[in-house]
């Protein structure tokens, strides 16, 4: 017996949509949504394809996701070509199976079933889909959100289909994410010969006390919803490669994953104060990837928890751990934002896969969420 969720997932996987190339995935989704009465608005920016689709009016529940995937890596190590989906022992293999073409298929099929049962639903059901999430994320959801906000578009609830689960579908729901702030720091010294250090100024030596103090800072202790803020040095570069040259510059890149106990401005102020304390000559460039956001218990969280408890008979954990997602952009609209998707154990890996039965379960959960919020 065929399953529409699995069939659509397989069709999407066959389209090698390496970010930001959509490779025809959105056209496939749009065709299905048009047939059930959705209005489609293409919102492409640069090399990125996006669409905003809606049906009905009033209080709005949007389903958000991305069609792009990361590269497959060494294809010879896959049990099957990465863009030729195959099912083995109940597991559906293929690049994007878990992140996140399975979720996209579950969303579309859930919408089809929902509309068939509730053709005159009271609220508005919407889709926000992009092909630029895995790479730069500069022309995707963030641009669509900016355009929607500029025309005062309403968005009350948003379900992002990122693979949130860890062992069984629905065991973890993300109801927020930490902020992400990166510092690109250059410490300036004076290049010279290692035999004549008095004629040079070694930026590595200069920066060492600063870095020691930086890594020892306890930024906060987190709160009931977020773990403590984490700072990690990601890259350090200095020197010419020669053993007899004192470097003239030291480049250090470090990233903060910060909770709602802090703001990006507070972090910047403390780092700059520390640099001044150590009397360093420096240039700095900051990149704020996203602010922290949190969706407290309310209609959306309650609907998601209800759907999981109904179909999987487990109580999900509400967590804010992990990396950033496009939910950080959607939260700017004032919407309640929650992430619910399949198990994430194999995302971005060789032989990415998802339990086929989980996708069928996910579609039922999505449909129940629709029924609770916009039926």
Swiss-Prot record:
- Co-factor(s): Zn(2+); Co(2+)
Where, in this chain's numbering, is Zn(2+) 1 bound? 66, 99, 162
List the GO biological process terms: diaminopimelate biosynthetic process; L-arginine biosynthetic process; lysine biosynthetic process via diaminopimelate
What is this protein's name? Succinyl-diaminopimelate desuccinylase
Query: What is the annotated role of this protein in its UniProt record?
Result: Catalyzes the hydrolysis of N-succinyl-L,L-diaminopimelic acid (SDAP), forming succinate and LL-2,6-diaminopimelate (DAP), an intermediate involved in the bacterial biosynthesis of lysine and meso-diaminopimelic acid, an essential component of bacterial cell walls.
Subunit? Homodimer.
Q: Which organism is it from?
A: Salmonella paratyphi C (strain RKS4594)
Note accompanying the cofactor annotation = Binds 2 Zn(2+) or Co(2+) ions per subunit.
Where are the active-site residues found?
68, 133 (proton acceptor)
Q: What gene name is given for the protein in this entry?
A: dapE
Q: Which family does it belong to?
A: Belongs to the peptidase M20A family. DapE subfamily.
Q: What keywords are annotated for this sequence in UniProt?
A: Amino-acid biosynthesis, Cobalt, Diaminopimelate biosynthesis, Hydrolase, Lysine biosynthesis, Metal-binding, Zinc
Known EC number:
3.5.1.18
Reaction(s) catalyzed by this protein?
A: N-succinyl-(2S,6S)-2,6-diaminopimelate + H2O = (2S,6S)-2,6-diaminopimelate + succinate
**What would you give as a GO molecular function for this chain, any one?**
acetylornithine deacetylase activity
Q: What is the lineage of its organism?
A: Bacteria, Pseudomonadati, Pseudomonadota, Gammaproteobacteria, Enterobacterales
